[in-house]
């Protein structure tokens, strides 16, 4: 049986908020089976909870925000959400003493490290997966994203950037998902932005935490970071990381094939909401019998040990 997962102990870290540039303390707490993923702002009195839910994603301009019915929001959840998806964490309470998750190094790797340091705990309840039964596709101009039936979780992502620093041969990436593949191939890919955009946003009091420490920064010709790229195709790998986090907003690991061209947070979320609204296109399944398990989600690999 594939079991639900949480962490073994409370783990805490501090970082900087991408938007405010101020210190943020992040605390992750184990949660009981069927709790789901809950983001909590402890800077408010009383604290406000934001369950991970595709319908709560309302603002996708610079990052993924969860917004409740009172217009209270928590920002920059996508990289942590990707780490949870990558490690198959079903139940967790995530507390921050600010309006945003810290940006860390702009990737999911620091969150993976924290979660593995806390230890993965398997619970006694069967893990629920969202399995695609029909293909669902959404489009926005020439951009599109699709989920289709597949016995596992595969991703195929293409970006289309006309930039000297981004070679045409590095604009597509495919992955047959597993926790090990996510940690090694995806989690370290950082977010990226143009120096001119960062300077403009900061002049308006936005993106105050943006720096070379938490993003790949490019000008019109090259990558400006002294250490360069972590992967030759780090840009498209990060877009895949974003998609993994965006799709996990349904609270379940997905069994299906994800394919996208120039997609971003908004289109990824529209795809997820379109799938969920089409009830005949998916089902929630558990795997009591090991023979039925998709390879991608069999017993935790060495990376989780």
Curated annotation (Swiss-Prot):
Q: Which co-factor is required? A: Zn(2+)
Q: Which residues form the active site?
A: 265 (proton donor)
Taxonomically, the superkingdom here is Bacteria
* GO-annotated cellular components: membrane
- SUPFAM superfamilies listed in its UniProt record: Ribosomal protein S5 domain 2-like
Gene3D superfamilies listed in its UniProt record: lpxc deacetylase, domain 1, lpxc deacetylase, domain 2
Under what name is this protein listed? UDP-3-O-acyl-N-acetylglucosamine deacetylase
